[in-house]
Amino acid sequence: ERGHHCLILRKGNNPCCSYLAFRVYSEDDVDKAAAHFSGKGMATEWVDRPFQGRTLRVLDPHGIPLEFYFEMTRLPTMHQKYALYKGVKPLRIDHFNCFSPNVDASVAFYNDMGFRTTEYTEDAETGHLWAAWMHRKGGVHDIAFTNGTGPRLHHIAFWVPTPMNIIDLLDVMSTTGYVSNIERGPGRHGIANAFFVYILDPDGHRTEIYCSDYQTVDPDHEPIHWDLKDPQRQTLWGAPAPR
C-alpha cells in the first residue's frame, strides 16, 4: 500500500469500530457517491480526516458507518525495503467482515454501489442468503456479510504473501506472551480457499491474517454457492469457529 494509512487507532473508553472507509477511483466519484446516496433519500455529510481530501460519510441501511474518499497523502513504496518487514509482514488491508440482520438487503445495497458477489451461503429452507462475500478490487472480497445482530464488525483482515508468514507470526506470538490471543487457526476456509488465522488484540478486536485466495477478474465469474449445512464452508480443515 502507498496510502498514508489503512488503519487508525484512537484511545477510547470502549473498544469499537467508528467507520469503514473505501477509496474511489477519482474525485468526481466522490461527488457521484454523494448524489447516489442522496438520490436514495439517505443522509450524507462531509467530514474532515487527517491526510485525506474530501471525505463523504453515510450510514448503510443497517447502520454501518461508511466513508468514501479519493485523495490521500502518498508515501514512497516499501515493497522492496525488506529490512523494514517485521512480524507477519502484512502487505495490505484486504477486507472487512460484518454481521447483517438481513443479508439479502445488504447484498442488494452494495450490489447497487458496484460490488459483486463471489461466493454465498444460502438457507435452502427459506431461500434467503445467510452470508455473502462481495468484491471490487478483484480478490474474493472487500466486504462480507454474515447473518446476525448488527451493525457489528466481525473482523478486519490483512493479506500476507504466503502461509509461512502466518506460521512465523504464531511462533512469535507464542513466545512473547500472546499465545492466548490466538483465537482460531491456522486453517483453510472452504469459502475463498484462503489460509488464515484469527487473532485478538488486547481490547478484543479480531484481526484475520489471510493469504492464498483467488482472483475474480473474470467478468463472467459465476458466484459460488455453498449450502448452509456444509461443514466445510467455514473451515475446509482446521479447528471449527468458536461459539
Question: What annotation goes with each model-predicted range?
Answer:
Residues 1-4, 47-50, 57, 98-140, ...:
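Core segments of cupin and vicinal oxygen chelate
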Residues 13-20, 72-76, 146-152, 208-216:
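Short, basic, helix/turn surface patches
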Residues 122-137, 141-190:
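A compositional/structural signature marking long, glycine- and acidic/polar-rich segments
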